[in-house]
Amino acid sequence: MDAIILCAGKGTRLHPITESRPKPMIPIAGKPILEHIIEKIENHVEKIYLVVGFEKEKIIEYFNENPKIEYILQEKQLGTGHAVLTAKNFIKDDFLVLNGDVIFEDSIDEILDYENAVALSKVDNPENFGVIELGYDNKVINLLEKPKKEELTSNFINAGIYKLQNSVFGILENLVPSERGEIELTDALKKLIEIGKLHGVELNGYWNDIGHPWDVLSANSHFLNKIISKISGKIENNVSITGNVIIEEGAVIKSNSVIEGPVIIKSGSIVGPLAYIRPNTILMENNFVGNSSEIKGSIIFENTKIPHLSYVGDSIIGANCNFGCNTITANLRFDNKPVIVNIKGKPVKSVRKLGAIIGDNVKSGIQVSFMPGVKIGSNSLIGANCLIDSDIEQESFVYKKDELVITKKRN
């Protein structure tokens, strides 16, 4: 049996983090979402076909040494069904299909027992997903895409993991494209439901559909809480390390710094002196966190510099960023209500604590503050003394004009 993992989409709801990388390559607890998925299935399959598109080179470069993996290019993203069809000539038997942005802990053993099956997750907000209704013997009897609350008949949702027979390719080829001109895998599932040939299998462990920035932070926190301490880097005098902490070889923790796990600090990173790294934080390769700076509950991508007297909380900071002294990310509203984030032009309630979401190659001057939930597009420059309270598009230059009054000193 082989597997198909769908990795071609642009992940626009996760901009600016996905402006320059595929969503499956976002790191969760130090490794890409896609690597987590592959680790769950690679012992069950002979070949893994990654359907790639946007920024495909970053996926290929990372996984190039895995002999089980082959790549299929989806030149135009015309739906999940179309993505599966691109693998038709490579699949000769039953196969798995997985969305490249779902992260889960449960074994897939049970789903393999059926000819056609979809994994299910039980959630509190099923109206935001494709809802699955089960009948006798775990047969799927209905699938509703993002129904209204009054239409809900189940708390089970489509978890984006499927085991299918080869014959599903024939169903996909005969589907009528949607109004958007796309061929959707869920439409093929509905055909299987009509003939009573689709079963549902509940996932009992952790599952997360990484669709929003706060989902990234939530998943990161969950998997960081599974790590086991391993200190391989250089630790200077008077450093306090508590909880489970991984410090890779080549990392340096300078004197009088405090690290509270779960935390991962990857190779080449320098922390301190007098820095404070709080729980649920990951510093990717070659980061710098300077004197008297504090990082809490955040993901800091590689080659980023957060210098002295700065605070980054509940934030995602892209690669190759360089902040000025006293950069602050606010992460909490006065009224303690969920932070509102602009997602594809619409205000969306996120979580109670959320800082800034900053793309790659962003530079800020001294004393820049970011209000909760703001997004800063890649390759932007933020001038000194700015308070950023709204989203900034990529390739922007933001600066503040203050009138400087100069007069002669009176005797």
UniProtKB/Swiss-Prot annotation:
- Please report a single Pfam family linked to this protein: Hexapep
Q: Which residues form the active site?
A: H308
Q: Where is this region: Pyrophosphorylase?
A: 1-204
Please tell me where UTP binds in this chain. Answer: L6, C7, A8, G9, Q74, G79
Alphabetical UniProt keywords: Acyltransferase, Multifunctional enzyme, Nucleotidyltransferase, Repeat, Transferase
Superkingdom of the source?
Archaea
Family, per the entry?
In the N-terminal section; belongs to the N-acetylglucosamine-1-phosphate uridyltransferase family.
List every stretch annotated Linker: 205-224
Q: Which organism encodes this protein?
A: Methanococcus maripaludis (strain C5 / ATCC BAA-1333)
Q: Name one GO molecular function term.
A: glucosamine-1-phosphate N-acetyltransferase activity
InterPro entries for this protein? Bifunctiontional_GlmU_arc-type (IPR023915), GlmU-like (IPR050065), Hexapep (IPR001451), NTP_transferase_dom (IPR005835), Nucleotide-diphossugar_trans (IPR029044), Trimer_LpxA-like_sf (IPR011004)
- Pathway, per UniProt? Nucleotide-sugar biosynthesis; UDP-N-acetyl-alpha-D-glucosamine biosynthesis; N-acetyl-alpha-D-glucosamine 1-phosphate from alpha-D-glucosamine 6-phosphate (route II): step 2/2; Nucleotide-sugar biosynthesis; UDP-N-acetyl-alpha-D-glucosamine biosynthesis; UDP-N-acetyl-alpha-D-glucosamine from N-acetyl-alpha-D-glucosamine 1-phosphate: step 1/1
Q: What is this protein called?
A: Bifunctional protein GlmU
Residue segments, region N-acetyltransferase: 225-411
Reaction(s) catalyzed by this protein? N-acetyl-alpha-D-glucosamine 1-phosphate + UTP + H(+) = UDP-N-acetyl-alpha-D-glucosamine + diphosphate; alpha-D-glucosamine 1-phosphate + acetyl-CoA = N-acetyl-alpha-D-glucosamine 1-phosphate + CoA + H(+)
Q: Does the keyword Repeat apply?
A: yes
Q: Name one GO biological process term.
A: UDP-N-acetylglucosamine biosynthetic process
- EC number per UniProt: 2.7.7.23, 2.3.1.157
Enumerate the Gene3D superfamilies for this protein: Hexapeptide repeat proteins, Spore Coat Polysaccharide Biosynthesis Protein SpsA, Chain A
Which parts of the sequence bind N-acetyl-alpha-D-glucosamine 1-phosphate?
T80, G130, N142, N158
Binding of acetyl-CoA occurs at A384, K401
